Regions:
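Outer-envelope beta-barrel architecture signal
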Residues: 57-63, 98-104, 157-161, 198-202, ...
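Residues that define the transmembrane beta-barrel architecture of outer-membrane proteins
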Residues: 82-88, 141-147, 181-189, 253-259, ...
Length: 518
């Protein structure tokens, strides 16, 4: 299950009572009712915890296990060509006394990616350029844990208050020499409030996020006198040193501050929520003896809207999002100094900065998305739907002195449809998407560098400039089961997909999930 599906499940549970009748709320909510609640909700699409009670929530939860496999011919070099995963996911919305409503989530994902190279870190693309890796392909094991705890109050006059904590741990280990291990800690704390007047609500959320990723050391099982380890500084610029993994350490620490401002209009037949936000991040990069190759800065601006309107037979949903992100890296030239204490004889090691290249590397990202879905709905749930959507993405990477640049643009648009059969016990969901690339450019100052030939040129020729289409099909069957007088809705879901690229490469994936709603 990918991130989009997980977010969808969150929305379903958050908004289970938005337009459901009171008798149904006391019963077990099935697949059809979850889809209706998700489509009609507004605040569950945001991270503003104060808005939890504006969607009229009830106690509801879900738990599931999922196993998946993906094989990819059409991929980038640093991604790998095969992935096996096992995931456990559970979440719960719960009243906490008279005045509070809470949400909790636990998500554990483990897996193995094969034939990945040139990157030993999690954020390889369009991010901090000071990464590292080996040109020798290998398998990588990952273990990721994601926790979320959010609580919102009921109304105190026109006011509501909330607090949300997102906490993630991750481990990415390479299983072939040189054997690196990347450890990640990421948490985000976001207090919020809303103010309601008439049909309108204003919301404000501020957040602090700290991201830390560390490669404490790199080990080897065998001795290879020709094995190089590379450190990158942006675009094709990579320095490969024989035995460079010996004593190597790298740490990334990012501090981000941001806010979200929301405005919502809610009525029984028509509702809309618009949210705008700004984030600013500052990320330090450290090595042995606090060596600093550079510093990375990010600015992110986003605006999003969700609008729904209801007729006796139909529920219309329109969603739009626009986001612009700009990042730049200052590159340092530092010299190691060794100071010897005349009394103890101990040496002190430190790095002194001699030169700074301001904004030597720059990233610009623009993402726009627009979607419309027409749902056939009754008071009990959605019986079927059809939707269209499109996304536009623009990527620019630039490196100065010497000058190198990369530009990538594509449009991705698709059609989706689904329908429930046998009293909505059995659901079929299908989707078809096209990816059209345009206006791509790659200009490298050193086209003969190993990183340029094996990564940038290879990805540009075989991935970035290639059109593709993909199709997916999901089958879901659910069955209520009563244990000790309590009924839960158990389900089993089989999901598959296929991608075909214009260069005759293809990808395939399949997953099986078993779970229950309680």
């Amino acid at each position: 299950m990918n991130i989009d599906h997980k977010t969808l499940t969150l929305g379903l549970l958050v908004s289970a009572t938005t337009i459901l009748p009171t008798p149904l709320q006391a019963q077990t909510i099935d697949e059809s009712a979850y889809r209706l609640a998700d489509a009609a909700s507004l605040w569950s699409t945001t991270t503003n915890a104060a808005g939890l009670t504006l969607d009229n929530l009830v106690d509801r939860g879900v738990a599931m296990m999922e196993a998946g496999h993906e094989s990819s011919d059409f991929h980038r070099v640093q991604e790998g060509n095969q992935d096996n995963s096992l995931r456990f996911f559970t979440e719960r919305y719960q009243h906490l006394g008279r005045y509070l409503y809470g949400y909790g989530k636990f998500d554990f994902d483990m897996g193995r990616t094969k034939n990945r190279r040139w990157s030993d870190v999690r954020r390889t693309y369009n991010s901090n350029p000071f990464i590292s890796g080996s040109e020798v392909s290998g398998s990588y094991d990952r273990q990721d844990i994601s926790l979320t705890a959010a609580v919102g109050t009921t109304a105190f006059g026109p006011w509501r208050f909330g607090l949300r904590l997102d906490y993630q741990l991750g481990d990415l280990s390479r299983l072939r020499d040189p054997r690196s291990r990347s450890e990640m800690l990421d948490y985000r704390l976001a207090p919020s409030f809303t103010y309601s007047f008439g049909h309108s609500t204003l919301g404000l959320e501020g957040h602090y996020r700290r991201y830390k990723e560390k490669i404490p050391d790199i080990t080897t099982v065998q001795t290879d006198p020709n094995l190089r380890y590379y450190t990158m500084t942006g675009m094709e610029n990579a320095n490969g040193v024989v035995g460079g993994y010996n004593g190597y350490m790298r740490e990334y620490v990012n501090h981000e501050f941001g806010f979200r401002l929301s405005y919502a209009w809610q009525s029984p037949s028509w509702s809309s929520l618009t949210e705008a936000g700004i984030d600013r991040g500052s990320e330090g990069v450290y090595g042995t003896y606090k060596y600093q190759p550079g510093h990375y800065h990010t600015y992110r601006y986003a605006v999003a809207n969700k609008t729904t309107w209801r007729t006796p037979r139909w529920l219309h949903v329109v969603q739009a999002r626009l986001q612009y992100e700009e990042g730049y890296a200052d590159e340092y030239r530092q010299r190691l100094t060794i100071t010897t204490d005349s009394l103890t004889g101990y040496n002190t090691y430190s790095y002194v900065n001699q030169m700074t290249y301001n904004k030597r590397y720059r990233v610009r990202l623009l993402d726009a998305a627009l979607g419309y879905r027409l749902n056939s709905a009754s008071v009990h749930g959605i019986n079927g739907y059809i939707g269209v959507d499109g996304t536009l993405r623009s990527v620019h990477n630039e490196y100065h002195l010497p000058a190198s640049s990369f530009a990538h643009h594509y449009a991705d648009y698709g059609l989706s449809a689904g329908h429930g059969f046998f009293a909505n016990r059995f659901w079929v969901d299908a989707a078809f998407r096209l990816r059209q690339v345009f206006d791509n450019r790659l200009n490298l100052a050193d086209v003969s560098a190993p990183y340029a030939e094996q990564v940038w040129t290879a990805d540009y020729d075989d991935y970035y400039t290639v059109n593709s289409w993909r199709a997916s099909l999901a089958l879901t069957y659910q069955q209520p089961i009563t244990v000790k007088g309590r009924t839960s809705m158990w389900f089993i879901r089989l999901d598959g997909g296929y991608l075909h690229a214009a260069n005759s490469q293809h990808n395939s994936r399949a997953s099986l999930a078993i779970g229950l709603r309680f």
